[in-house]
């Protein structure tokens, strides 16, 4: 709750265990963070939740017949888009994305990557964590390599995958 109030948002690596609430609807999952930010005693009406969810379903291309469908029945890519929508709804100052394209299909991966770029271009600070080097070099304004919680090197935007791999390998030498 404090993180939300301070403008921090996290899309976790483990979407199914730490991201979605499978039994809740797409609508409820998208509204979770905004509801939490509003605090105890204040509630989004069902109509407000529906309008919010429908806006993000359209914006992110979440494939669902209805926003009242349990999110656990959606594909992994559509679940991930709904988690991204949840955090976009609160307009965080910093969006932390931990392996946001892990385990999703190629089309959903492309859509999510495009949205991440739009968010960053719109001024949102994005911390992008990925083991997919092609994704890292595509979205990064700066690439920082960490090992055991310590910074071992940094590269500017536009660096090649080979340059990143060289930096990683240099630390193992």
For every predicted segment, state its role.
Residues 1-173:
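Glycine-rich phosphate-binding loops of nucleotide-dependent enzymes
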């Amino acid at each position: 709750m404090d993180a939300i109030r301070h403008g921090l948002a996290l899309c976790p690596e483990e979407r199914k265990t730490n991201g979605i609430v499978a039994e809740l609807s797409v609508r409820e999952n998208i509204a979770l963070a905004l509801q939490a930010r509003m605090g105890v005693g204040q509630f989004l009406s069902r109509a407000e939740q529906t309008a919010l969810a429908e806006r993000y379903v359209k914006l992110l291309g979440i494939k669902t017949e209805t926003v009242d469908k349990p999110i656990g029945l959606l594909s992994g890519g559509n679940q991930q888009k709904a988690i991204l929508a949840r955090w976009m709804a609160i307009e965080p100052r910093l969006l932390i994305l931990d392996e946001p394209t892990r385990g999703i299909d190629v089309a959903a991966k492309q859509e999510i990557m495009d949205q991440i770029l739009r968010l960053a271009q719109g001024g949102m600070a994005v911390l992008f964590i990925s083991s997919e080097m092609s994704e890292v070099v595509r979205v990064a304004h700066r690439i920082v390599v960490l090992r055991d919680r310590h910074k071992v090197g940094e590269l500017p935007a536009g660096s090649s995958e080979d340059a990143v791999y060289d930096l990683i390998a240099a630390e193992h030498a």
